[in-house]
Amino acid sequence: MVDVNRFKSMQITLASPSKVRSWSYGEVKKPETINYRTLKPEREGLFDEVIFGPTKDWECACGKYKRIRYRGIVCDRCGVEVTRTKVRRERMGHIELKAPVSHIWYFKGIPSRMGLTLDMSPRALEEVIYFAAYVVIDPKDTPLEHKSIMTEREYRERLREYGYGSFVAKMGAEAIQDLLKQVDLEKEIAELKEELKTATGQKRVKAIRRLDVLDAFYKSGNKPEWMILNILPVIPPDLRPMLQLDGGRFASSDLNDLYRRVINRNNRLARLLELNAPGIIVQNEKRMLQEAVDALIDNGRRGRPITGPGSRPLKSLSHMLKGKQGRFRQNLLGKRVDFSGRSVIAVGPTLKMYQCGVPREMAIELFKPFVMREIVARDIVQNVKAAKRLVERGDERIWDILEEVIKEHPVLLNRAPTLHRLGIQAFEPVLIDGKALRLHPLVCEAYNADFDGDQMAIHVPLSEEAQAEARILMLAAEHILNPKDGKPVVTPSQDMVLGNYYLTMEEAGREGEGMVFKDRDEAVMAYRNGYVHLHSRVGIATDSLNKPWTEEQRHKVLLTTVGKILFNDIMPEGLPYLQEPNNANLTEGVPAKYFLPLGGDIKEAISNLELNPPFKKKNLGNIIAEIFKRFRTTETSALLDRMKNLGYHHSTLAGLTVGIADIPVVDDKAEIIEESHKRVEQITKQFRRGMITDDERYNAVTAEWRAAREKLEKRLIANQDPKNPIVMMMDSGARGNISNFSQLAGMRGLMAAPNGRIMELPILSNFREGLSVLEMFFSTHGARKGMTDTALKTADSGYLTRRLVDVAQDVIIREDDCGTDRGLLIRSIAEGKEMIESLEERLNGRYTKKTVKHPETGAVIIGPNELITEDKAREIVNAGVEEVTIRSVFTCNTRHGVCRHCYGINLATGDAVEVGEAVGTIAAQSIGEPGTQLTMRTFHTGGVASNTDITQGLPRVQEIFEARNPKGEAVITEVKGQVTAIEEDASTRTKKVFVKGETGEGEYVVPFTARMRVEVGGQVARGAALTEGSIQPKRLLAVRDVLSVETYLLGEVQKVYRSQGVEIGDKHIEVMVRQMIRKVRVMDPGDTDLLMGTLMDINDFTDANKDVLIAGGVPATGRPVLMGITKASLETNSFLSAASFQETTRVLTDAAIRGKKDHLLGLKENVIIGKIIPAGTGMARYRNLEPHAVNEEEYLNPPVEEEGNEETTEVVVDTAVETVEETVE
């Protein structure tokens, strides 16, 4: 076997007959599998030990040679080599076919590769191959055309006409093989290139397609006649096993049935040929052989599939590769692993951020080898076998050893579905009793876990390196920030929020108000002994608190509450004292009004101060973000644990309860509803009198009921008691929102009908009063729709993530700086008046391209190629700068990835991104993970002016990334200039928009009902939308440059996500969009050897042009192509990645003809072949480090190394019938 971590590339080609023979260890001549009595493989059968190797390790079939000492000996009695059984997984056999057979992939695929090579229609090919017609192979002197088709009857007539032997015509795959042998690739290619110079329309398209296939054969060195099989490989028997079930029956792989049919028909054909049977019988047998081979390679591709018992189609070789259950996705891209377990999760409130609780019985099983090694090392027993027995008996001594073994040995916890990289994190195990895994409450948000029965899987990293990586890179305490937006993902929730909210409340007139304490301990003691209430405002000597005070503040008394003193106790020392829940206090310190000079009147000072609101969930989030910014991970995770403990403690002390009496009653609800009823009557009257249309009536009625609900909501908010438990839960952000509250106490309002239209009858009751039967019935529609939507959305969003990951999986940070000379000019994204993403948000964490100067003073704010920090971004925006040129992924020149400067900071860490970071996968997860939060709806723009539906939510995101024609497409102008007129044409129900510019005039026809975006006299740019709606990006690409299209797509994706309140960093969308515009279509090859009309990577295109320009030739011209993510994934340079994504057979067929080489640059390819992935610590620059003793002389003057001298082997993979097998050449 090849050492998998050593080879550089993998090639797939067509297998020549000699190649198949070289793989084979013998011919399979009989259809038998195993003997029903002895259960031993039959001689020359499908499981023959002579061909495929012994069924028992180091033992021949007859038992003459047993034991390892005879390895490599071939038994003289039974002819079986003495070796490992494992060879039965890798040794192949073959079947010598008595008649050539066509390979269905190359004949049936779309486009038919055989058809293009021979310039024959697939229909004609089918007739010839399946013995329905003759094809002329050599017309000799007759007027017949070469490759023309004739029926049996015509053939006989021609023979009579021209005489026997006057021309050659054949049928079957043999005929096609002869024709393929006649193809002169060089000559045909030259002719096609000539033809392309003049051809147009369909002819041109066909010529380009033929040229593509012929050129592929020519360049790869594959012979076209290899598409016809004379010899069929038989895959190793352990890949198509027969298993004995209890009850003496056998379960066998379908492939054995399919091979058996081929062998039976082949043997029968051999016999008929020996007997010189009549031609028609031989023909029929050859046709049946052809069908048997078709079924073996791809059952069901042509005609009805061959079925097994219960009319179930048999699984052929192609099916073994295809789909979710196929070889690629089931066994290569992800496998089941040992040293893993799963269990229900329970909450572990006492754990530290980096810990998880693992049940004892689970841990002993998972860490068994480590425990056994330690038992032997301590001389408790002498060997591993005895140690194993000790562990399995559950000896008392093993538990102490287990405790020691798991110290410092992190484990990974994973919750399905793993939507982003925070779905797998590392923890230090803590042994617990019980059978449930214990999870820290703060990491629940990252996992999206709750404790209503969720299960989680646990994995043990085994090697030292794996443990080190888990500890350094994956420890839960390190994952404070969310990679999608750089905001903290671990914010306290529920009880923790409630406790801190209650703790920091302020109340007037509670016991102990106005007392003054000398230090924290005195204040807390007074509180513990009941002299002062947690919420009372008191004074404390400022200098007793260890905080960054000014000299003046130090000698005063601080007015605060005991609760806030306790709250500030848990904060790091460098942070200001937190008195008000706002950002000013957090960054600049306590406002002056809270300081009282020594000897001042404290009662009066307190009465002059307003009560502060308590700290809510949002404020806690801001505090965490600020602490992370200042102190980084270690301090932040320690603070989070302290905040968690404080929150749980005080929510327990607060003792919040909820009863029916806590739901307030709105006194004037009846009047508000009565008023609305009257208004609705007036609206209906207007409609009856014909003053308004039905649409207007409907809109007015629904608007009226919405207003009524809002009025009730406002009353509720105005009259609420801040100490009401429900209000406290809602206000603190612990649970529930104003909408839930108003359904409990106000009214439920309007409901949606099953068709998505809002019903005019509102639900007037709230949950406290209870609903009537009719109201209850109405509200069930919405509930059901919600459940269905969620289920559908999850599947859709998961599939979107899969496509995104696939298209960007090879985008890795490859170098420090690509040295590009281009940048991206950015400004804030806005839709009309509404701000979608501010300039400050877009600048944070990016590198500048040009110097940014103050627009008024001209002072330099930041130089070129510098990192824009949060503070710098704020400074730029405050200076009034509206647009900045930054380094962007769009303009990065790095091949197969991005450079550090164009990417900016890694949002998950807040530092500059490291070389080796798999930013493509992170981008895909960041866009896909919130997909489930987006809606599934297509909104109807209510009422009058809508003939277009605006797609939003998940369908819109898919529409953008798949580059589809949008629903409700906007009309765009190709001319830059002024709108001169808009004319309405009532007869055709359209409008015409006229645009006049310097380069020419444009006239655009717009639907009558479309809403216009422009007015007469307005200026429009090229590619600007004239009507409301989404622009079709492919049209935009035709009139504008690539960067404009990329910028447009970026803005569109942001609009969808931001409108749903989901924040995603621009750079993630940039990575995805860049992958959609990586290809160029060659329009004119110039002097290069590129083919016209082919799609190729931008980098390869520029390389080809570079060579020609250096030689002084004419470069090729190309046009950038925008592809949807699915198409882009299939067009990737890696055939392994594409084949494992979708359309496996088509990808492999194409790759084999081209003799494609996979250079293993992406992640998937390497996972498939079992090589360490080239990202993170798997990158060559980190892997090829040799530890050596430092020689000072060398250290100061390092020797220059030559490049490209690492030892590698090339691996060539051939596809024959379908087997992908590795051979080293």
UniProtKB/Swiss-Prot annotation:
Molecular function GO labels: DNA binding; DNA-directed RNA polymerase activity; magnesium ion binding; zinc ion binding
Keyword set, alphabetical order: DNA-directed RNA polymerase, Magnesium, Metal-binding, Nucleotidyltransferase, Transcription, Transferase, Zinc
Cofactor list: Mg(2+); Zn(2+)
Binding site for Mg(2+): D450, D452, D454
One cellular-component annotation, GO: DNA-directed RNA polymerase complex
Biological process annotations from GO: DNA-templated transcription
SUPFAM superfamilies: beta and beta-prime subunits of DNA dependent RNA-polymerase
Catalytic reaction equation(s): RNA(n) + a ribonucleoside 5'-triphosphate = RNA(n+1) + diphosphate
Residue positions binding Zn(2+) 2: C818, C892, C899, C902
Function comment: DNA-dependent RNA polymerase catalyzes the transcription of DNA into RNA using the four ribonucleoside triphosphates as substrates.
Family membership: Belongs to the RNA polymerase beta' chain family.
Protein known as: DNA-directed RNA polymerase subunit beta'
Species whose genome carries this gene: Streptococcus pneumoniae serotype 4 (strain ATCC BAA-334 / TIGR4)
Name of encoding gene: rpoC
